Amino acid sequence: MVTKEQRRQKIKARVRGKISGTQEKPRLTVFRSNKQIYAQLIDDIAGRTLASASSLKLEMTGSKKEIAAKVGDEIAKAATEAGISTVVFDRNGYLFHGRIKELADAARKGGLKF
């Protein structure tokens, strides 16, 4: 029987074969744990992280969805400071629902296009 984590890893590998980030259009990848949420802008060609934001850095209170939205705002601010306006969204095998959706919507409101 395939567990949820094995399913996510399988989807992640399949999607990563199809999308890649560049300097001009980096990959916005999201990692979600039970308590925290992390977002990174990655240039896959150079193998560098251009910007990052996480709920650990912000030390916020509120619901998990509210915190995810704040992380989305922070990654959008970091991207505009780095001169990035368009990204490729990598949900990392997670369903586009709940905290992942909140982060993506907040990043879009912050000015990122994907």
From Swiss-Prot:
A GO molecular-function descriptor: 5S rRNA binding
A Pfam short name: Ribosomal_L18p
This protein's record includes keyword Aminoacyl-tRNA synthetase: no
Keyword Transferase: no
GO cellular component, one term: cytosolic large ribosomal subunit
GO BP, sorted A to Z: translation
Keyword terms: Ribonucleoprotein, Ribosomal protein, RNA-binding, rRNA-binding
Subunit note: Part of the 50S ribosomal subunit; part of the 5S rRNA/L5/L18/L25 subcomplex. Contacts the 5S and 23S rRNAs.
Entry function: This is one of the proteins that bind and probably mediate the attachment of the 5S RNA into the large ribosomal subunit, where it forms part of the central protuberance.
Similarity comment: family membership: Belongs to the universal ribosomal protein uL18 family.
Name of the protein described by the UniProt record: Large ribosomal subunit protein uL18
